[in-house]
């Protein structure tokens, strides 16, 4: 199951990014829902929200280490709960998708743009970002629901 999630996530990310590269040009949006949702091409040379701009070697190195650690944990420990396996698989697939961009282009292709007229603009992102975010949400749910959570008294 884990390998299927990882491979499908990478394929979905690559196909959508290749579409964005071929179909969109910088500054030319495809409006899907007026004043709310469009596709807008962006070459992100940093990480989330543009942090670590032009630090590709650092970002590539950190990403590779994180992927290897997550894969080691995912595939070595066969007794991991299903939600943890899915969570890590989603995060790994998204991390690999953006890693491919960083190595191939020296930037990450972003193209999904939510906004409200000209007043609110959510940062432009891609499918790999969605996979990492969904995986992280599932990981948080797993941590919160894990047995013994109440005994940790984190919030007391």
UniProtKB/Swiss-Prot annotation:
- Positions of the catalytic residues: 110, 129
Q: Kindly provide the name given to this protein in its UniProt entry.
A: Lipoprotein signal peptidase
One Pfam entry for this protein is: Peptidase_A8
Q: Which organism is it from?
A: Clostridium tetani (strain Massachusetts / E88)
InterPro entries tied to this protein:
Peptidase_A8 (IPR001872)
Q: What is its main location?
A: membrane
The alphabetized UniProt keywords are: Aspartyl protease, Cell membrane, Hydrolase, Membrane, Protease, Transmembrane, Transmembrane helix
Membrane-spanning ranges? 57-77, 83-103, 124-144
Q: Which domain of life is it from?
A: Bacteria
Q: What is the lineage of its organism?
A: Bacteria, Bacillati, Bacillota, Clostridia, Eubacteriales
Q: Which reaction does it catalyse?
A: Release of signal peptides from bacterial membrane prolipoproteins. Hydrolyzes -Xaa-Yaa-Zaa-|-(S,diacylglyceryl)Cys-, in which Xaa is hydrophobic (preferably Leu), and Yaa (Ala or Ser) and Zaa (Gly or Ala) have small, neutral side chains
Q: Where found? A: Cell membrane
Q: What is this protein's function per UniProt?
A: This protein specifically catalyzes the removal of signal peptides from prolipoproteins.
Q: What does the record give as its pathway? A: Protein modification; lipoprotein biosynthesis (signal peptide cleavage)
The signal peptide, as residue positions, is none
Q: Name one GO biological process term.
A: proteolysis
Q: Which GO terms describe its cellular component?
A: plasma membrane
Membrane-protein topology: Multi-pass membrane protein
